[in-house]
Amino acid sequence: MFDIDGVIVRGKNVLPSAPETFQQLYDHGRGAWRVPAIFVTNAGNTLRQQKADQLSNWLNVPVTEEQVVMSHSPLKMFTEYHDKHVLVTGQGPVEFIAKSLGFRNVTTMDELRCWFPALDCVDHKRRRAAPCSFNQFFPRIEAVVLFGEPIRWETSLQVRTISLHNHKTNPCERGTRNVDPMKYISAFTAAD
């Protein structure tokens, strides 16, 4: 088991001894690893195949998707959530990552912010003057999936908090798009 970050690469730079070491672990004549090899990372901003391709390029040995374990890889086992409406946030192609793990009903943080601009009381510069057009009966968010740290973590945290406080009523129901988020949170806290 090989950690990627800090062991094979530091930042974007491959550590000088890494390619040479992995050349010794891979038998090019047989086209097979001399020892079982798996690569792990706490990163969650890319797909396993992309990380395998990157490792193959860095180390000059073939690395398959099955040999890569990302921070989000275990979510594939949470099949009870795959049909639920999930809010996904993080960096990279979060919607594509979620769907590749089996989640079928996905809303991204950017989509939610666009549909309900009043929910984002942190980032006023990115707030839209009016919500995007959307289905009047926005489905209840039933789970939140975080793929690593979002770039704008404060906005993501604030909007996720509102979503998590939403276990009795949907914050995205018709007529709540322009509600004051703090009054909204207070209403749910008081009702608990």
Which residues make up each language-model segment?
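HAD-like aspartate-dependent phosphatase fold
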Residues: 1-192
